Amino acid sequence: MSDLVQEINRRRTFAIISHPDAGKTTLTEKFLLYGGAIAQAGVVKGKKNSRSATSDWMEIEKQRGISVTSSVMQFQSGGFCINILDTPGHQDFSEDTYRTLMAADAAVMVIDGAKGVEPQTRKLFKVCAMRHIPIFTFVNKMDRETRDPFDLLDEVERELGIETYAMNWPIGSGKDFQGVYDRAESRLLFFSGVSGKNRADKMEVDLYDSQVATLLDSEEKHQKLIEDVELLSAGRELDMEEVRCGNLSPVFFGSALTNFGIEPFLEAFLKLTPAPLARVADCGTIDTFSPDFSAFVFKIQANMNKAHRDRLAFMRICSGKFQRDAEYYHMQGGRKMRLSQPQQLMAAEREIVEEAYAGDVIGVFDPGIFSIGDTITVPGKKFLYSGIPTFAPEHFCRVSAKDSMKRKQFVKGTEQIAQEGAIQIFKLPNSGMEEVIVGVVGTLQLDVFQYRMKGEYGVDLRMEMLPYEEIRMIAKSPCPLDELNLGSDAELLEDYKGRNLLVFSSYWAIDFTVRRNPGLELQEIVVAEG
């Protein structure tokens, strides 16, 4: 086997998704702990002196205890090279999450054992299902009072339309949660230890061993466990082809907080999840193991390091081998380039790398030439990877700098944050950038925008929410745009590409405007590839 094939086969690149507060970021930390990447896990919520989670690198994330931007973390464990893409769980940042899922070969779906399938779980699952990537389910918080495990499996199948296969089974729940039964190895794993910051000790016992009743403090509990396991055995078998197609989800139970069940989950997951998958381009499917390098940009982030004040473009390598200082071709820019400072990341920590392989994510310095969705290839191999989803904003805010002397910083900040895809900026026709209209999917994005403008660019903002919630592109106008008959429930805007749009206070206002302007044709901005 060639070195190229061997290296690519070692890669495991996956995203972790969940509804807010299901424990996604804590699980990410425990992957790093058991993978040997960190000596002690941070805790997202807890004592004030607990350090913040490794994956939450932005200052506002550390303060609020939530993830508002995707993090990329690479580490080596058990012969695998692991690339974790941690995503925001909050629905206001779903656009960043959707883009990140485009770079993943598999997904870990974290579910709260007490709450089951929640709204954001459904939305993110749909994106994974559209891509037909393997989806592994981790039922978290078994250390708390949870719903019946069989009911949870039924709900996943009913709500998400995917078959399930329990890879392990919980031994008790809440204060009685002591471990899991590993079905593949036919063993009971009892865990102990009170702090979730360190590895949990475990003891292996046979399911039918007489000491199990003693460990469970009840012969009745032992018999119930045996009955559950035997009931599972009468069900469907694990079909890896169905897993790879995204039709069957292996399910694991555990507690990210106490670490119970985390180590066997990570070990099994790395064996089951696929090596980097082939990608579709406009010329057909690109072979992952082709020696020719190719990649696409799925994320842009400014000011990850305050000392540098730079901007990184995150590239998912789709084929071949990347080498530092080699010559590559930027398809959208139509030019050759050398990427001399490629970096691999552990959240905000960076390290210059000489080479990387298909499946890896690298960050490259971006002087403003890259956009989300761009394709990079070797010279002579020109094609475009499928686009990245973009979303129509649902909330709009008029924004300007409180201090007019800060105009330059205001323009730079809004443009850079918009290029990251965190916000969309519009302006009134024939106006400058002194005042802009910011559009976002969720209002929490406005809080983050305001926080970053102050902290990263030194600009205090004047912000006025606007009564608009719908936006449409003008496809055809019956008259000059400034002569359109618009009421108080509509306003004409331009985007950064100079395209003309209308924003409306309601869906009914759209219909009213079209009827008042015969010949006006509007296009809906939907989740689209761009």
Indicate where each model-derived feature is located.
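Structural and coupling elements of P-loop NTPases
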Residues: 1-530
